[in-house]
Amino acid sequence: ERVIEFYAEHKHEIAPFELNRDHSRVTEATLAALAAPGTASTSKELPVAMISDDDEQEALRRVADLERAYDRVHGGFGDSQKFPPHSPLLFLQYAHAAGLSAQAATMVTGTLDAMMTRGLHDHLQGGFFRYTVDNDWTIPHFEKMLYDQALLLWNYSIASRLFARTGYRETAEGIIRSLEETFRVGAGYASAHDADTNHREGATYIWKLEEIEERLDPGEFDAMLREFSLSADGNFERRNHLVRIIAPGTREDNPDAARRAPDPALVGRAMDKLLAARRERDQPDRDEKVVLGWNALVGCALLAAHRYAGVETARPRAVELADYLVSTFVSAEGVAHVALGDQLQNQEFLADVGALLLFLTMLAEESAELDHRYRDTRALLEQRLASLHDDGVWMESRPTDLTAVPAEPFDQPVPSGMALAEFALLLRQIRSHEDYAPRPFADAHGRAFANLAALASRGYFYVVESPEGVAWSSLPVNSVQVFGEGRSSCYRGVCYLGLPPAPEPPNAPPAEKTKRKRRR
């Protein structure tokens, strides 16, 4: 503490001091060169982003943009139909992990609580519907999309670590259950489930009150009445779509709700019975196409579930998925887009290549063996990305019979191919100790995923080097792992021996989080 206080008071008197990868001191000449006007990239002697005093303010401006649109009553953004805001939530969570904004945490938890509690969530089997037609997350459009499951799994997994709420971990586990039970096609995942069953929207998912009562014993029925908002009139076409009364896993923060809550065992038993009954009904049709990019996002999310939610089955499933995607979609001729049975649609898209490269780059952080296993494939994918990049402009595709299609920069609803490619390439540059330029911050509503690269390239991700890898439970969420001979960490322009500070308690006051950040 005294050293920190001394530094805070006298830092203007202390000469710049950084470490090379071999832990020797960086020379003053190198530091002077890095500080020269117009210098945008790092030195190999100092494999961390150039740090600007404006970085934090720019990040906070993007958070403030989201705050202005945040629905403080219902969670989410805007005041009409509610779509899950995947990329804004990821940006806010990484910004919060970096200690940039306490308000980011409020927006994240308010939105995640609403989505998992109310009608967007399939409470019986896990997973999520496409969007809700109202602003309070009650009645969904009952379609289920693979990319929603992937990106919500990513978000809930991170949140389970950042905020230590059991409901977030349980929601992540429920998404994986839905993926395995309803989306799984061989070693990959199907694209979607229709909203209709026999031409009726949501018919598989909604209940008359008496249907629920006749399936349960009295104690179970009473527990359901206390857990969910149920009535004879219902909330959708005189039937009930299940909406919880209070967010699961948050009762520890609400003692009064905890006292009035039903026995969880009774609720669980009742829900199992209702799911069994639901399986006897006709089911929505499933779109059997396996889309490469969406499956690669599932892979990224499975790794997040392994790292942050502690789901033991997630990493082996991610490895199995990676092997399938590489063997099925990648060849020397290019990268295919869709598989349907034995048929491939071979047109190459930036979003597919970028998502797969990001997945394999994240997987390479898991072990030296996995790093080596996919090295050649990652190199091939980078070549394919280079073929989709002309004079600083990304192309979404190059059809053989048409002109090239310029890439859109917007996330709608999956991250843009541009943002996926940029983040994947940046992570590879970080892990290879290469020079890289800081990425610009982008509009937090339409291009939020690009801000992950902006944060990482400006030093807001820890770069942790070790010979054999470090348990993810010991690292902050905003960490990148590198395999090397030494043991060191870099953050916000400072490299030092050893690991980053242990993750802070999730409920630490915002002032303490800010104080810790400024000490580094």
Spans of features found by a protein language model:
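Extended, hydrophobic alpha-helical segments in both membrane/secreted and soluble proteins
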Residues: 128, 152, 302, 314, ...
